[in-house]
Amino acid sequence: MQRAGSSGARGECDISGAGRLRLEQAARLGGRTVHTSPGGGLGARQAAGMSAKERPKGKVIKDSVTLLPCFYFVELPILASSVVSLYFLELTDVFKPVHSGFSCYDRSLSMPYIEPTQEAIPFLMLLSLAFAGPAITIMVGEGILYCCLSKRRNGAGLEPNINAGGCNFNSFLRRAVRFVGVHVFGLCSTALITDIIQLSTGYQAPYFLTVCKPNYTSLNVSCKENSYIVEDICSGSDLTVINSGRKSFPSQHATLAAFAAVYVSMYFNSTLTDSSKLLKPLLVFTFIICGIICGLTRITQYKNHPVDVYCGFLIGGGIALYLGLYAVGNFLPSEDSMLQHRDALRSLTDLNQDPSRVLSAKNGSSGDGIAHTEGILNRNHRDASSLTNLKRANADVEIITPRSPMGKESMVTFSNTLPRANTPSVEDPVRRNASIHASMDSARSKQLLTQWKSKNESRKMSLQVMDTEPEGQSPPRSIEMRSSSEPSRVGVNGDHHVPGNQYLKIQPGTVPGCNNSMPGGPRVSIQSRPGSSQLVHIPEETQENISTSPKSSSARAKWLKAAEKTVACNRSNNQPRIMQVIAMSKQQGVLQSSPKNAEGSTVTCTGSIRYKTLTDHEPSGIVRVEAHPENNRPIIQIPSSTEGEGSGSWKWKAPEKSSLRQTYELNDLNRDSESCESLKDSFGSGDRKRSNIDSNEHHHHGITTIRVTPVEGSEIGSETLSVSSSRDSTLRRKGNIILIPERSNSPENTRNIFYKGTSPTRAYKD
């Protein structure tokens, strides 16, 4: 076989699967395509001696050694046997129908007999029309189709030519022989099935008694005594006509006409284009109507009963439908399936060159802060949608995984004073978020703190025992909390109508000022916007981030059990949701997860949240917590002016070594309210001393930006605010640690407890 070496195709003869398809594609670039079929090695060697002139240029050639053997030894014997069987059944009396009984003087069987020469459609005419009509139509249609497709460039749409046994069979000859051969075989099969049913049933035709001429006198009994006759009492001279009168069900004219009409109609539907809107329906309806008329003439001329004709239509149409769909593949070219398979096996280079399949690369670094924040917020949506674009069967495509895990973006947001942005919200299908309205009543806060103090005293020993437990195996977790000035709204399964850019991520291990050599972490108090209601956004646990530690699992079970018991009572008391969450944490204890490093700092989120009165209109600072900082961007930016007392700058003050823990207090909202009772515990005195140190500094307008890099974590509880880090600081909720600033003589000192002033020009970098 002459190989198309100009295209770099491999010269193997027996190739299967994707190798054969690539060989065809490569050889087509050089002007010819050499197709090989399974087991085609012998035919390829026989065709190796053919010169290039013997092969038509620009034609698709397929070598096969199974075409002629199958045709000679399988298809022709089957067709010949069906023709021979039909001959014996139709033209000889070798097989006779059974003798079925009839009633005496039955009027339905006494219709006049019409000679074959007087029939509207004789049997020979039926055979000629049923065989020759569709066969000629198919051959003419294939010739026109071949001429039209041959004029196209590179013969697009043509089936490959077959080179078998040194003979070249073009697509016209192959398709015509295949379609006409199946049609002839279908007609023979339909006639055979009809004859077998007729011989088996022996139902009489409407003219049976006319040609039979029964001799009722030969019976032992009269017709009045026994009206149903099963004996052969026919006295007619023409036995052939009498036997034909016993083969009425089903009608042979109806079956053959229905088969021919349905088969040729399917051919027209598959091969004709939609260029002419009326030509295809015209041809289809013409053949269908001809078949129906052919069957109805058998009823009008008393050759068959109506039920015989209707059943013949069903039998012939069913056989034609089966052969048209499964024997000839609905008359579609066999190359279509190969082209579809080739598209699925395209190489990676072809996919890169195809603009419709190019995967858009993600730019991980950005100099613009807003664009970077929006990219973080929309990462889950992009990662989820990118997976659907990579599902291509049987395609060897190397998928580059993203740099960060997908679908694990747990975030912390303190958005009480954050500006609103008109960016599309990102719905996370995993977390279920809720926004709960918090009360602003200072008297109520004082009453709750008194109750917590009494409950905390009784559980101090149990909490100390939990503090000494060994470290859990759960990785650090992230929390998501949202404090907003919007009205109370609750959303389940991500159905909350809030801007998506207000969800940021924080990891306490990256907070500046945390010294690993010290036992505690920094203290931060965040002031709320004046006159705003508080919305605290607490996510439930995610499905993929669940710790497998035995101790953390037991703590989680304790937390969930307590939450179920206290939901009803908390709602009945009409307490704020954030107060209920903190109360549960004080009652049930803390979810313990000690850091791996014994000297690792700990940041505890306590429940001593105080409320800011609605009449306080002092200026408030803006704290912005951002996640995922880039390498080329500063981690912490604190605009400040000068250092010193009253400068208004934020400072991270290291704790005293005598203190075991420090507190990361959120939303100290009631600094101007009436004094509350201080809880006296083992940690309260140290924190109160640190609070008095900072009481003389004033807080001015300023924006503090804290950018921290989150790490992948696992959530333990559904409504917890505690996170743990292995080496860095940990944000945890302690039930026995409640820090309340002392009462100051002046409102200004009370306001600035836990605060350091900030100024709009200084920036710290980690």
Curated annotation (Swiss-Prot):
Compositionally biased tracts (Basic and acidic residues): 672-697
Keyword Zinc listed: no
Keyword field contains Zinc: no
UniProt tissue specificity: Brain-specific, it is exclusively expressed in neurons (at protein level).
Summary of the knockout phenotype: Knockout mice lacking Plppr4 are viable but show a severe alteration of synaptic transmission leading to juvenile epileptic seizures. Excitatory transmission in CA1 pyramidal neurons is significantly increased. It is associated with transiently reduced weight during development, a reduction in brain size and higher mortality 3 to 4 weeks after birth. Heterozygous knockout mice, show loss of somatosensory filter function and altered resilience during stress-related behaviors.
Matches recorded under CDD domains: PAP2_wunen
One family name in Pfam for this protein: PAP2
Transmembrane segments: 68-88, 120-140, 179-199, 248-268, 277-297, 309-329
InterPro entries cross-referenced by the UniProt entry: P_Acid_Pase_2/haloperoxi_sf, P_Acid_Pase_2/haloperoxidase, PA_PP_rel
Phosphoserine carried by residues: S37, S347, S386, S439, S462, S474, S608
Residue ranges of the region described as Disordered: 454-494, 634-654, 672-701, 742-766
Positions annotated as glycosylated: N215, N220, N269, N363, N433, N456, N515, N545, N570
Biased composition, class Polar residues, residue ranges: 743-752
PTM description: O-glycosylated. Probably at Ser-347.
Compartment list: Postsynaptic density membrane
Biological processes, Gene Ontology terms: G protein-coupled receptor signaling pathway; inner ear development; lipid import into cell; modulation of chemical synaptic transmission; phospholipid metabolic process; regulation of postsynapse organization; regulation of synaptic transmission, glutamatergic
Membrane topology: Multi-pass membrane protein
GO cellular component annotations of the record: glutamatergic synapse; postsynaptic density membrane; Schaffer collateral - CA1 synapse
Key words, A-Z: Cell membrane, Glycoprotein, Membrane, Phosphoprotein, Postsynaptic cell membrane, Synapse, Transmembrane, Transmembrane helix
PANTHER family named among the record's database cross-references: LIPID PHOSPHATE PHOSPHATASE (PTHR10165), PHOSPHOLIPID PHOSPHATASE-RELATED PROTEIN TYPE 4 (PTHR10165:SF13)
Family statement: Belongs to the PA-phosphatase related phosphoesterase family.
Protein's job: Postsynaptic density membrane protein that indirectly regulates glutamatergic synaptic transmission through lysophosphatidic acid (LPA)-mediated signaling pathways. Binds lysophosphatidic acid (LPA) and mediates its internalization into cells. Could act as receptor or a transporter of this lipid at the post-synaptic membrane. Modulates lysophosphatidic acid (LPA) activity in neuron axonal outgrowth during development by attenuating phospholipid-induced axon collapse.
Protein name: Phospholipid phosphatase-related protein type 4
Species annotation: Mus musculus (Mouse)
Gene: Plppr4
